[in-house]
Amino acid sequence: MRSKVTGAQRWVVKIGSALLTADGKGLDRGAMAVWVEQMVALREAGVELVLVSSGAVAAGMSQLGWTSRPSAMNELQAAASIGQMRLVQAWESSFGEHGKHTAQILLTHDDLSDRKRYLNARSTLRTLVDLGVVPVINENDTVVTDEIRFGDNDTLAALVANLVEADLLVILTDRDGMFDADPRNNPEAQLIYEARADDPALDAVAGGTGGALGRGGMQTKLRAARLAARSGAHTIIIGGRIERVLDRLKAGERLGTLLSPERGMLAARKQWLAGHLQTRGTLVLDDGAVKALRESNKSLLPVGVKTVQGSFRRGEMVVCVGQDGHEIARGLANYSALEAQKIIGQPSDAIESLLGYSAEPELVHRDNLVLV
C-alpha cells in the first residue's frame, strides 16, 4: 500500500500552524527552512508540489502582541492580513535560497463553488506547477465570512487536491497520525497505519478539537481525507515533528496513517460537485429513489422525493438523504425549493400542469449528481 506514496507524482502538502510557529511567538524560520529543504528534494525527485500553509493568523497575532487567538471575525481577519504578508515572504525567501520560486494563491469558497472560477483556479495552479513554481495556498481570511469560509486548512487542502487531481494529500499535524484511542489519555493506544477513508470505525476515534493556534482537529482531518478520496487521492495524516518526515515518506517508510479511497477518480465535473461544501437545502428521498441512485446511476425524479427542506434556487446545491437522514448524494437542483414543493411525489409528466411550464423532467439530473 505504501507504494501509493512512493509512486505519487503530484503531492499537496498541508502544514499546520503549530509546525510553523515558535510556540505562538511568530514564524519559526528555522523550522520553515527544514520544510523547504525537504520540499525542494521532492521537486528534484520529480514530484509536482502544492503547499497549503497555515500560520497567517498566528504570525499576525505575534506581530500584534496577542497571546490568545481572538474569536471575533474582524480581529481574526486583521491578524490574517498582517500575518499573510510575513508568511508568504518567509516562504519565498526560504525557497529562493534553493533557486525555487513560489506563488501566493488565496482562495475563498466562492472561487470553487462557481464553475468558471473553479476552472480558472485549476488552470492557474496547473500552469504554476508546470513551470516548476511552488504554489503557496491559504484561505483568503481577510474577506470571508462564517457562512462562506472553508472552516480550516485541512478542508481547503482536500479541495485543492481535488482541484489539481493530486495523487497524494499529506496533512502534517502535531500528532503522529490517527490512533485507535486518544494517546493523551490511553498509553495503550495504537497507531492506525492504514485504513479506508470511508471506514465508519474511524469516526469513533477521531474526536477532539484543534490546538490553540489552529482550527482543525482530527475530525476535520478525517473529513478532509474523505473529501480528497472523492477524486481518487490517498491521504496521509502524519506527525510534523517526525525528523525529515517528507524525505522518509518518499523513501517508503511506514509512518503516519494512510487513508485510501474506495473508488477511483471521479470525472472532472463530478469532482467539482463533490467539492461543494455550501449546500442550500435538503431533499428527503423514498426507498425506491435511494436504490435508483445507488444502484442504477439514475437521475432523481420528483416522484421519489418525500420532503423538501431549506430555501434554494434553481442551479443551487442540495443534499439528498434517505428517510433515516443518511446522506446519499448531492447535486444541482433543476427547480427552486418553492417549485420542488409543488411537484414532489408526482410523475414528471405532471410538472407542466402543476407549475405552468416544464424545465426538466428530473429534479436533479444524474450528470449534476454525485454519490457520497
Curated annotation (Swiss-Prot):
<feature type="binding site">
    <location>
        <begin position="173"/>
        <end position="174"/>
    </location>
    <ligand>
        <name>ATP</name>
    </ligand>
</feature>
<dbReference type="Pfam" id="PF00696">
    <property type="entry name" value="AA_kinase"/>
</dbReference>
<keyword id="KW-0547">Nucleotide-binding</keyword>
<dbReference type="InterPro" id="IPR001057">
    <property type="entry name" value="Glu/AcGlu_kinase"/>
</dbReference>
<keyword id="KW-0963">Cytoplasm</keyword>
<dbReference type="InterPro" id="IPR015947">
    <property type="entry name" value="PUA-like_sf"/>
</dbReference>
<keyword id="KW-0808">Transferase</keyword>
<keyword id="KW-0067">ATP-binding</keyword>
<dbReference type="InterPro" id="IPR005715">
    <property type="entry name" value="Glu_5kinase/COase_Synthase"/>
</dbReference>
<dbReference type="InterPro" id="IPR036974">
    <property type="entry name" value="PUA_sf"/>
</dbReference>
<dbReference type="GO" id="GO:0003723">
    <property type="term" value="F:RNA binding"/>
</dbReference>
<dbReference type="InterPro" id="IPR041739">
    <property type="entry name" value="G5K_ProB"/>
</dbReference>
<dbReference type="GO" id="GO:0005524">
    <property type="term" value="F:ATP binding"/>
</dbReference>
<dbReference type="GO" id="GO:0004349">
    <property type="term" value="F:glutamate 5-kinase activity"/>
</dbReference>
<feature type="binding site">
    <location>
        <position position="153"/>
    </location>
    <ligand>
        <name>substrate</name>
    </ligand>
</feature>
<comment type="similarity">
    <text>Belongs to the glutamate 5-kinase family.</text>
</comment>
<keyword id="KW-0418">Kinase</keyword>
<feature type="binding site">
    <location>
        <position position="54"/>
    </location>
    <ligand>
        <name>substrate</name>
    </ligand>
</feature>
<comment type="pathway">
    <text>Amino-acid biosynthesis; L-proline biosynthesis; L-glutamate 5-semialdehyde from L-glutamate: step 1/2.</text>
</comment>
<dbReference type="GO" id="GO:0005829">
    <property type="term" value="C:cytosol"/>
</dbReference>
<dbReference type="GO" id="GO:0055129">
    <property type="term" value="P:L-proline biosynthetic process"/>
</dbReference>
<feature type="binding site">
    <location>
        <position position="14"/>
    </location>
    <ligand>
        <name>ATP</name>
    </ligand>
</feature>
<dbReference type="InterPro" id="IPR002478">
    <property type="entry name" value="PUA"/>
</dbReference>
<dbReference type="InterPro" id="IPR019797">
    <property type="entry name" value="Glutamate_5-kinase_CS"/>
</dbReference>
<dbReference type="InterPro" id="IPR036393">
    <property type="entry name" value="AceGlu_kinase-like_sf"/>
</dbReference>
<feature type="binding site">
    <location>
        <position position="141"/>
    </location>
    <ligand>
        <name>substrate</name>
    </ligand>
</feature>
<dbReference type="InterPro" id="IPR001048">
    <property type="entry name" value="Asp/Glu/Uridylate_kinase"/>
</dbReference>
<dbReference type="Pfam" id="PF01472">
    <property type="entry name" value="PUA"/>
</dbReference>
<feature type="domain" description="PUA">
    <location>
        <begin position="280"/>
        <end position="358"/>
    </location>
</feature>
<keyword id="KW-0641">Proline biosynthesis</keyword>
<keyword id="KW-0028">Amino-acid biosynthesis</keyword>
<comment type="function">
    <text>Catalyzes the transfer of a phosphate group to glutamate to form L-glutamate 5-phosphate.</text>
</comment>
<protein>
    <recommendedName>
        <fullName>Glutamate 5-kinase</fullName>
        <ecNumber>2.7.2.11</ecNumber>
    </recommendedName>
</protein>
<dbReference type="InterPro" id="IPR011529">
    <property type="entry name" value="Glu_5kinase"/>
</dbReference>
